[in-house]
Design a protein with these regions (language model features):
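Charged alpha-helical initiation segments
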Residues: 1-26
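A structural signal for alpha-helical segments
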Residues: 2, 23-26, 30, 114-117, ...
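Alpha-helical transition-metal enzyme core signature, strongest for iron centers
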Residues: 7, 11-14, 35-42, 126
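Surface-exposed polar/charged interaction patches
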Residues: 17-20, 69, 136-139
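N-terminal interaction modules that seed assembly of large macromolecular complexes
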Residues: 19-56
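Long, charged low-complexity segments
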Residues: 54-57, 63-121
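Glycine-rich, aromatic-bearing surface loops/beta-hairpins
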Residues: 121-140
């Protein structure tokens, strides 16, 4: 399979998970992993199909692939926005850290949770990001 097909497949799987009325912990983790894999394959596809002169990215994890792609002048503004503290990658990393955190029962805190609203936000941000990248690359 081509990288773009794998990216779309993982995105479809994550959307199917959101289509369920109730999501359990294992499905939350699968959702996060699928979105991350989809982003990783999308980065590979962009790298493979463009004339961008960058260091190889196949050995990097998802986040660092995008950081390397952000060195491209044509893509810098789009990717940097999503790498910021309010961007897609930060939201995804927060969701992952929430999933793996251990709550300290001795502390009184209000802790952030993963919920359907957050996962829908991730999918919406990802689709908008992907569409903007596609339009930019088609114009270049």
């Amino acid at each position: 399979m081509k990288n773009i097909e794998l990216s779309n497949l993982y995105l479809d799987i994550s959307q199917e998970i959101l289509g369920k009325s109730l999501i359990n912990n294992s499905e939350e983790l699968i959702f996060i992993v699928c979105v991350e894999k989809s982003l990783s394959y999308l980065a590979d596809d962009i790298y493979d199909n463009s004339t961008i002169d960058l260091n190889p990215i196949e050995h990097l994890n998802c986040l660092y692939k995008w950081k390397e792609l952000s060195n491209s002048i044509a893509l810098r503004n789009i990717i940097t926005k999503e790498l910021s503290s309010e961007g897609l990658f930060s939201i995804l990393e927060k969701s992952k850290s929430i999933f793996f955190r251990e709550d300290n029962k001795n502390l009184i805190t209000t802790s952030e949770i993963n919920d359907l609203k957050k996962f829908n936000l991730i999918i919406d941000r990802y689709k908008a990001f992907k569409e903007l990248l596609r339009k930019t690359l088609d114009e270049c």
